[in-house]
Curated annotation (Swiss-Prot):
UniProt modification remark: The homodimer contains 10 disulfide bonds.
MF term (GO), any: ion channel regulator activity
Keywords associated with the record: Acetylcholine receptor inhibiting toxin, Disulfide bond, Ion channel impairing toxin, Neurotoxin, Postsynaptic neurotoxin, Secreted, Signal, Toxin
Propeptide: 25-45
Protein name as catalogued: Alpha-conotoxin FrXXA
Domain notes from UniProt: The cysteine framework is XX (C-CC-C-CC-C-C-C-C). Displays a mini-granulin fold, a structure composed of two short, stacked beta-hairpins connected by two parallel disulfide bonds. This newly described fold is derived from the same cysteine connectivity as knottins (ICK fold). The name 'mini-granulin fold' comes from the structural homology with the N-terminal region of the human granulin.
Expression tissues: Expressed by the venom duct.
Organism encoding this protein: Conus fergusoni (Ferguson's cone)
GO terms for cellular component: extracellular region; host cell postsynaptic membrane
Amino acid sequence: MPKLEMMLLVLLILPLSYFDSAGGQAVKVDGHGDGMDRYLQRDDREARITCQPRGRSKWGRCCLTQMCGNFCCPRYGCRCVYRSGRGHGCSC
């Protein structure tokens, strides 16, 4: 099988939950809540995080900045505000 076909096959097989178009980090919760802690301990990161579980799934989405609705704000210091007619948005 040529390399291009193999790459396409791999991309089709990978679950889409690994990719987050809103910029969040997909994290598997292990039931004790320390999965994200271990992620942040790498490279001595000091970050405040916000996480949002997804129903009964073990997967959730976490932001290293402020979470606003279903996406992450672009940088630290932003606030999540609700704008009537447009929904949630970041105010930086």
